[in-house]
Amino acid sequence: MMLHAQHMPGQPGTSSLVFLHGFSGDCREWQPVGEQFHGCSRLYIDLPGHGGSAAIPVGGFADVIRLLRATLISYNILKFWLVGYSLGGRVAMMAACQGIPGLCGLVVEGGHPGLQNEQARAERRLSDGRWAERFRHEPLTEVFHDWYQQPVFASLTAQQRQALTALRSQNNGETLAAMLEATSLAVQPDLREALNALAFPFYYLCGERDSKFRALAQEVAATCHVIRNAGHNAHRENPAGVVDSLAQILRL
């Protein structure tokens, strides 16, 4: 089994860019940024529970990484950079720490390296469980209205919140809930030590108004790019700034 994806071919002999979206996003999320790198092959993946992969069930990160590897093989992608936002960034970090073959470099935007104690994991398990129940049983417009009131999204304007709520409400609540539980921070290991031992380039992007993830970026051995005029979802709030950072990283 493989994940649904959109593939855009580039020039032969270049490393591919593999884009992983955030929770409740889909393969379209990164395209405004990725299409500025038309010389590279680009693969935009729908993670399990999302978009064209909504019906694909997973029990945890191991299943997600296995599906990611199968998808890369199916497109004959042998050398690649992983570029992931939030949930996609956590999947990318997990894949990197597990030694996914062919990985040339890692770019994470606003991805959490992992909780560091059992109390924090227990609290997160309860919180994600409550959200999952809401996704399963309540209208998605109501759930996402509240979702975007969380402190991490404080930099969004009312108009941006409204647009995101309308966009994300097109999802399937049941499959979102299942993916939220399967990949919760409560079940993700603390990746700091493994990330600090990576043998390939690791870059971290965060919005200048995202104080939580700017602090987390200092806890991993990554080169940090701060995106101006942006909060947690920097590639949506300032795509040109993220394009500039990626161009520097990839030396394009």
Curated annotation (Swiss-Prot):
Keyword hit for Repeat: no
One of the GO biological process terms: menaquinone biosynthetic process
Gene Ontology MF term list: 2-succinyl-6-hydroxy-2,4-cyclohexadiene-1-carboxylate synthase activity
Enzyme class, broadest EC rank: lyase
Reactions catalysed: 5-enolpyruvoyl-6-hydroxy-2-succinyl-cyclohex-3-ene-1-carboxylate = (1R,6R)-6-hydroxy-2-succinyl-cyclohexa-2,4-diene-1-carboxylate + pyruvate
Source species, domain of life: Bacteria
Pfam family, one: Abhydrolase_6
Pathway(s) this gene product operates in, as recorded in its UniProt entry: Quinol/quinone metabolism; 1,4-dihydroxy-2-naphthoate biosynthesis; 1,4-dihydroxy-2-naphthoate from chorismate: step 3/7; Quinol/quinone metabolism; menaquinone biosynthesis
EC assignment: 4.2.99.20
Keywords: Lyase, Menaquinone biosynthesis
Family annotation (InterPro entries): AB_hydrolase_1, AB_hydrolase_fold, SHCHC_synthase_MenH
SUPFAM superfamilies: alpha/beta-Hydrolases
PANTHER family for this protein: 2-SUCCINYL-5-ENOLPYRUVYL-6-HYDROXY-3-CYCLOHEXENE-1-CARBOXYLATE SYNTHASE (PTHR42916), PROTEIN PHYLLO, CHLOROPLASTIC (PTHR42916:SF1)
Family according to the record: Belongs to the AB hydrolase superfamily. MenH family.
Subunit-structure text: Monomer.
Job of this protein: Catalyzes a proton abstraction reaction that results in 2,5-elimination of pyruvate from 2-succinyl-5-enolpyruvyl-6-hydroxy-3-cyclohexene-1-carboxylate (SEPHCHC) and the formation of 2-succinyl-6-hydroxy-2,4-cyclohexadiene-1-carboxylate (SHCHC).
Protein's name according to its UniProt entry: 2-succinyl-6-hydroxy-2,4-cyclohexadiene-1-carboxylate synthase
Encoding gene (name): menH
